Amino acid sequence: MACPTNPDAVTLLENDTFWVRQRTKAFYWQITLMHSHTLARAATITIPMLVIQGERDISVVPAATRQAFDRIPSKDKTFISYPEYEHDTEFAIDRSQLDTDIVSWIKARSV
């Protein structure tokens, strides 16, 4: 499995007994089922939707996220990609732009 570039996150994950260290056939089957379920459900989303994607993510590839996003019929949907982010953005060394984008998106829709 890919590991974050943040040294503190690497240490944390290496000591986490539940962190997936290898991808098995069962893992890939579960991902395939989840992907098809996500695509089917995407077509039913009509509420405001913010979709964020790390372009270095190898677990949820950007093309698959974009495919799901394109199926969302909501009239208020936003897709933001981050070139430097991987899958787990909470492990990013600097996630200030992501946090700013999320807060701005929520504030723009707050009453």
Language-model segment annotations:
Residues 1-40, 47:
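Alpha/beta-hydrolase
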Residues 21, 56-60:
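Acidic catalytic loop of the alpha/beta-hydrolase fold
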Residues 25, 61-65, 91-96:
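Conserved strand-to-helix beginnings and helix N-cap segments that scaffold or border functional pockets
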Residues 43-45, 71-74:
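Short, conserved loop/helix-junction motifs that constitute active-site signature segments
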Residues 45, 51-53, 57:
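Short beta-strand/loop motif that positions the catalytic acidic residue
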Residues 47, 61-70:
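Short alpha-helix in the alpha/beta-hydrolase fold that links the catalytic acid
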Residues 78-111:
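Catalytic active-site module of serine/aspartate enzymes centered on a nucleophile-bearing elbow/loop
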